[in-house]
């Protein structure tokens, strides 16, 4: 009897101990899971009354990924990545190439979302960005853009941009004539959950004034201008916002990867900087090796004499302060160089941020309409007469036929230059782009 009692007490204690241990494990697991869930929630950017010391790290496992990936066959992947499907005798393909400047057939087969290779340096994966950064308004202007390409641009932005940094996407339709960009576009914008505003111009304004219209409707701290046929890459926005947060007068561009116009293959860009020649033709130049010296290596921001203009970020108040775009320039062309000179000569800085990557379709040029050629000439001359000082003669030596062409009233822009206390073009050559002065005698 006594043995039975002792045995019962022993097994009872053992059972109690087991249940106690299981209860402890259960409670501990719930506590850890709850803490992990909370710790993964991003801190609201610029939220009032919060002191933020925590940093968000975007490594290879923490990069936001598209919520839907279009499934494709191996054949489709081969077509898009290797370009093996390009049929030079396909009349439909040539018709679309002439209309849109790139291979629309492959674009449509990809759907509106796809994964692109992460082309950043491995050192970029170790970069830390604060949880508290400025918010961004993305401005995308379009005119008769292929509908799927526009959706690919918007989808890549919404899928690969943290929602707490994305204030809004502002679409500016510059009076497109394509039916798909009317009711169909309005219908599909519902999928972007209210983050997208669309402005429809009542007359054709051209890219420059369309961007000014978009910027006037923005409410984010930073304006990010994107072309309507690009795809942003992973962790593309944070490096741009971080640079601007450190220096409000810094204007920044991503490193622009190439999306082939015929195969839509996404190709990484080498480290480059934007420059131009005395014909005012923009071009990409290699970066000097000594500029990449130091602990940051290939992730170091690249000092750039000029920007290509299609994709860049600038603090909204600074954009207004330095005079936005020259609103009397027409359509597009050379507004990028005018803004680049103004940034450098009027107290700002222009950098390319290698850890930010955006792919851009290099559309096939099939000849410019006479209206665009006329607009570019007009824009050339406004830039030359406002910003080049005595060096404008270098331009006219190469383009003598433009010396007596009219270019409108530039008084407002000349007064802006005086009001901002801008430096001379000689200063720009001495301090920003000495290689251009060295080429003075090369015609």
Curated annotation (Swiss-Prot):
Glycans are attached at residue 87. The chain crosses the membrane at residues 5-27. Its cofactor is Mn(2+). InterPro entries: GalNAc-T, Glyco_trans_2-like, Nucleotide-diphossugar_trans. Residues 301-363 are annotated as: Catalytic subdomain B. Disulfide bonds join 124-355, 346-422. The keyword Transmembrane applies. GO terms for cellular component: Golgi apparatus; late endosome membrane. It is found in: Late endosome membrane. GO terms for biological process: spermatid development. SUPFAM superfamilies: Nucleotide-diphospho-sugar transferases. Residues 1-4 are cytoplasmic. Substrate binds at residues 174, 204, 228, 332. GO terms for molecular function: metal ion binding. Belongs to the glycosyltransferase 2 family. GalNAc-T subfamily. There are two conserved domains in the glycosyltransferase region: the N-terminal domain (domain A, also called GT1 motif), which is probably involved in manganese coordination and substrate binding and the C-terminal domain (domain B, also called Gal/GalNAc-T motif), which is probably involved in catalytic reaction and UDP-Gal binding. Probable inactive glycosyltransferase required during spermatid development. May participate in protein loading into the acrosomes and accumulation of ubiquitin-proteasome systems around the head-tail coupling apparatus region. It is linked to Defects in GALNTL5 have been found in a patient with primary infertility due to asthenozoospermia. This is Inactive polypeptide N-acetylgalactosaminyltransferase-like protein 5. The lineage of its organism: Eukaryota, Metazoa, Chordata, Craniata, Vertebrata.
